[in-house]
Amino acid sequence: MSNTKERTFICIKPDAVQRGLIGKIFERFEQRGYKLVAMKMLKATKSHLEIHYQELQGKPFFNDLVGYMSSGPVIAMVWEGLDVVKQARQMLGATNPLNSMPGTIRGDFSIQTGRNIVHGSDSLPSAEREITHWFKPEELCEWSSATATWVYE
């Protein structure tokens, strides 16, 4: 079983930033009871994104994805909590928003795969790799949430 210190990487994509959805996406994680340990807004470089999406190199959509992700600001975040990698993926919904259930972030706010508003780590090893790629260790804030006793037994 996962522990309450498990971490995942979530990135709000340029389309969601432009559409003013940052707060709505952020709120889903807070309301669920997850703890934010890092967040920053930046315009990612193509080279940074090529490393982030390295497992997709060679796919026909790779260059379009990198171009889109570098077209505007993104919000990079690290969330912490019990089973957060798996639960965050369920909260996001399917990569193709048309296959996402209503109530999921993508099911509620997006229509096309190429503009699916948010990225989330797909496994614990991916989360660890993505967190270290986007954040320096000193950017991760260790803190105790006053609400933790109301979220966890």
UniProtKB/Swiss-Prot annotation:
PROSITE patterns: NDPK (PS00469), NDPK_LIKE (PS51374). Keywords: ATP-binding, Cytoplasm, Kinase, Magnesium, Metal-binding, Nucleotide metabolism, Nucleotide-binding, Phosphoprotein, Transferase. InterPro entries: NDK-like_dom, NDK-like_dom_sf, Nucleoside_diP_kinase, Nucleoside_diP_kinase_AS. It catalyses: a 2'-deoxyribonucleoside 5'-diphosphate + ATP = a 2'-deoxyribonucleoside 5'-triphosphate + ADP; a ribonucleoside 5'-diphosphate + ATP = a ribonucleoside 5'-triphosphate + ADP. It is found in: Cytoplasm. CDD domains: NDPk_I (cd04413). One of its GO terms (cellular component) is cytoplasm. PANTHER family: NUCLEOSIDE DIPHOSPHATE KINASE (PTHR11349). Major role in the synthesis of nucleoside triphosphates other than ATP. The ATP gamma phosphate is transferred to the NDP beta phosphate via a ping-pong mechanism, using a phosphorylated active-site intermediate. Homohexamer. This is Nucleoside diphosphate kinase. It comes from Brugia malayi (Filarial nematode worm). The gene is NDK.
